């Protein structure tokens, strides 16, 4: 009663309200922490605005009565939606008037009387402590009214009450328009739109990334296929290589020739600039050896001999080899002749030796005969000595002739 006096409510009680008051006290044994809101006429002048209460997975309505009270319906537990609640206009006014009862929110008393709360008042007393209600705060000891909130003007409260009463059947009241604040009490507005748009933005970003990655893969495949087709290996035939060498020589050598100019001179549809460039590099490294001159110090190119030069070199080397073989044969012949001359000389020497041996044997016989025939005349002895001397001279003359002939032959060779 003190809180009602603080808010300026009158203490006069109507007959119907007093009868309901006595019946409730008898039924619930006069609860000590119960709170009674009185004065029907005063509340008609200063009605309390009714609003929807939502929090988490529960929801409920605040129903107005004919006397201007706001009846707090139960917040549906276990995830019951607002659509399961009946509209405001479907409840009769007589029933709303009969349900203008004190706000009692003590959970311990509800637990002690589970069977007595089966009637429609059970939903009224099963009010959640976690649900925020404007100008009302539920506590374990009861429901207290926040005295710091200022009340609106009487005309605004009266208009809101009239609008709540005049709601048609089958349609729900627009609480955001009636209360003028859709951000704080609209359950749909508790979740800001940017948070709702975040998954959509993520999905669109992922789709864009997938599209970009697929496009990159397609472009990479196309570029790789184009490079592969442009850089296919080509077999250089001897005829094509000869044409390449002629084109390089026409352009002034491998250092001055460019792949583009060589490609124009070749005029082969199967060739590309990559083929000509690689072949030109190989031609430079294989066919030319850079050398530095002693005077200028600039690199000089020494061209390899062509096929004709190689053939001429082969002919020259073969001629030289044949000449060397001929000389070797001649030397061998001369050596063979010398061997024959030496053999003939050796035979002559042996012959002369045998002849001398015969002469010595004859002389020995003559001496023996002299000793045996001491009586022989000196003329016979002188004749024998003269024969021996003549034989020796002939032998020496023959030897000298053979030696001089062999010397002449050696000199001629």
Swiss-Prot record:
Motif stretch (LHEQLE): 335-340
GO molecular function, one term: DNA binding
Region: Coiled coil, residue numbers: 322-342
Factors inducing expression: Not up-regulated by Pi starvation.
Record flagged with keyword Coiled coil: yes
Family label: Belongs to the MYB-CC family.
Name recorded for this polypeptide: Protein PHR1-LIKE 1
Organism taxonomic ancestry: Eukaryota, Viridiplantae, Streptophyta, Embryophyta, Tracheophyta
């Amino acid at each position: 009663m003190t809180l009602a006096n603080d808010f300026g409510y009158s203490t006069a009680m109507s007959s119907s309200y007093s009868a309901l008051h006595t019946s409730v006290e008898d039924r619930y044994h006069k609860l000590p922490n119960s709170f009674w809101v009185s004065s029907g006429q005063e509340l008609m002048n200063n009605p309390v605005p009714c609003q929807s209460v939502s929090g988490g997975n529960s929801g409920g309505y605040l129903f107005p009565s004919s006397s201007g009270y706001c009846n707090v319906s139960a917040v549906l537990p276990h995830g019951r939606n607002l659509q399961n609640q009946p509209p405001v206009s479907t409840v009769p006014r007589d029933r709303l008037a009969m349900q203008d009862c004190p706000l009692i929110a003590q959970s311990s008393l509800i637990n002690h009387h589970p069977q007595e709360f089966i009637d429609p008042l059970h939903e009224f007393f099963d009010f959640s402590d976690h649900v925020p209600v404007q100008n009302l705060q539920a506590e374990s000891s009861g429901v207290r009214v926040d005295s710091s909130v200022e009340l609106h003007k009487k005309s605004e409260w009266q208009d809101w009450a009239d609008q709540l009463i005049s709601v048609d059947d089958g349609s729900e009241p627009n609480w955001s328009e009636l209360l003028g604040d859709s951000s704080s009490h609209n359950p749909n507005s508790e979740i800001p739109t940017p948070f709702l748009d975040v998954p959509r933005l993520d999905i669109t970003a992922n789709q864009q990334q997938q599209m970009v990655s697929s496009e990159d893969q397609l472009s990479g495949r196309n570029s790789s296929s184009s490079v592969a087709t442009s850089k296919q290996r080509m077999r250089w035939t001897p005829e094509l290589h000869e044409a390449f060498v002629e084109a390089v020589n026409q352009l002034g050598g491998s250092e001055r020739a460019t792949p583009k100019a060589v490609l124009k001179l070749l005029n082969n549809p199967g060739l590309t600039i990559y083929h000509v460039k690689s072949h030109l590099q190989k031609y430079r490294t294989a066919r030319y050896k850079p050398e530095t001159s002693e005077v200028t110090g600039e690199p000089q190119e020494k061209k390899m001999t062509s096929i004709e030069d190689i053939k001429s070199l082969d002919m020259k080397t073969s001629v030289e080899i044949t000449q060397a073989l001929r000389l070797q044969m001649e030397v061998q012949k001369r050596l063979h002749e010398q061997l024959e001359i030496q053999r003939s000389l050796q035979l002559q020497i042996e012959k002369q030796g045998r002849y001398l041996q015969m002469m010595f044997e004859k002389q020995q016989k003559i001496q023996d005969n002299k000793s045996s025939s001491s009586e022989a005349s000196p003329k016979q002895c002188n004749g024998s000595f003269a024969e021996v001397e003549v034989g020796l001279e002939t032998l020496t003359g023959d030897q000298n002739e053979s030696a001089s002939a062999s010397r002449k032959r050696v000199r001629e060779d």
